[in-house]
């Protein structure tokens, strides 16, 4: 079929008009589409290697020996002995290490308790991640040991296991001994003696005042309320000054 020049121009014009209309319509549809939301999965807390530990952590986040902050806090670091539920020595030395800011808060708890003739005795503080792995290998039970897949708040240097003592260092009566994983160790257990429940509450109130939160299953365990800001560490206790 042959077209004269005018007809050809008319066809070209029609095609241009059709293309413009289609483009405008498509643009209009895109403008009406809701904006795409990009969801970013949070990165897991990194394990900080020994080589950069001291040099890169800010002073408030470094691990410190609690005895350098308040020497009046008594120690009975059970995992440095065989006197624990695993019957194994897991720490090379008896030391309570905590993040500096956490240690400062615990020192304030000790100071307050001394005003009423009491004090703290610590069973466990910072726990290297590799020790948690060892514990899980022996007893892979989340009721007793933190699953290494998530890590422990002890691994962050932001958790403490402890009890109360009198002026002479004698432990006050509590509902259970340390590392008793029965319901009697729960924070709301109403059995046992009235004295043990009162002492448990004194400890809880003293810790809460300075920013520590207890857990439901262990009367002796307290987390710093800001524990999430600290990364999991695997620093040997022997390297902490």
Could you describe each region identified by the protein language model?
Residues 131:
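Short, well-ordered surface patches within globular domains
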Residues 2-11:
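Bacterial N-terminal signal peptides that target proteins for export
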């Amino acid at each position: 079929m042959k077209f004269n020049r005018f007809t050809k121009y008319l066809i070209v014009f029609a095609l241009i008009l059709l293309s413009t209309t289609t483009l405008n319509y498509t643009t209009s549809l895109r403008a009406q589409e809701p904006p795409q939301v990009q969801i970013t999965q949070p990165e897991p807390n990194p394990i900080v290697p020994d080589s950069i530990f001291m040099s890169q952590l800010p002073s408030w986040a470094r691990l410190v020996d609690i005895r350098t902050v308040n020497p009046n806090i008594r120690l009975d670091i059970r995992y440095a002995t065989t006197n624990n539920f695993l019957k194994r020595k897991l720490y090379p030395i008896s030391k309570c290490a905590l993040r500096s800011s956490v240690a400062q808060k615990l020192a304030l708890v000790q100071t307050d308790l001394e005003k009423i003739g009491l004090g703290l005795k610590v069973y466990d503080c910072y726990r290297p991640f590799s020790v948690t792995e060892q514990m899980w290998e022996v007893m892979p039970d989340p009721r007793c040991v933190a699953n290494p897949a998530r890590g422990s708040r002890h691994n962050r240097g932001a958790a403490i296991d402890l009890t109360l003592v009198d002026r002479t260092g004698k432990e006050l009566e509590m509902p259970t001994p340390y590392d008793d994983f029965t319901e009697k160790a729960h924070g709301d257990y109403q059995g046992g003696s009235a004295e043990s429940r009162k002492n448990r509450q004194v400890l809880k109130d003293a810790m809460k005042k300075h920013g520590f939160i207890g857990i439901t299953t262990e009367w002796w365990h307290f987390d710093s309320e800001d524990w999430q800001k600290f990364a999991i560490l695997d620093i040997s206790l022997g390297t902490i000054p």
